[in-house]
Amino acid sequence: MADVTVKRLDEFEAVYGGGMRRVRAGLGVSSFGMQVIELPPNFELYPEHNHTHDEQEEVYTVLNGRTTLRVGGEDHELEPGVFVRVGPAEKRKFVTGDEGVRILALGATPGSVYHAPEFSEEGAPPPSNVKAHESSV
């Protein structure tokens, strides 16, 4: 049998009431982090964070909806078809407007072997604090 995994988004384990889908674990990806984040309209509680602790860079793209990504005091409007890379030291935060958003988040540490955070494994409890959430992809 071919080494391939195919799943629909709703087949991945959800945490935070569906706010995050454990896509990396569900597909068996081991070389980089990958999650789908869903935020409702007018949501401002997504934690501002950076990745100085693990030097992970992240790439985000919107699958549907729109959001504002705040990085280094600047707002970047994201919609489907737009990709953005954020360096490890930059604090970042998503804020939604009148519509919600579904974001694909990818992350890895340049030049290093990827080590998935425990909470990203299927069946693990979701992060219970902001520090644990900082390694969300």
Question: Can you annotate each of these PLM segments?
Answer:
Residues 1-33, 40-41, 115-137:
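A short, N-terminal "cap"/entry segment at the start of jelly-roll beta-barrel domains
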Residues 20, 36-54:
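Conserved short histidine dyad/triad with adjacent acidic residue
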Residues 68, 88-114:
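Ligand-binding loop in jelly-roll beta-barrel domains
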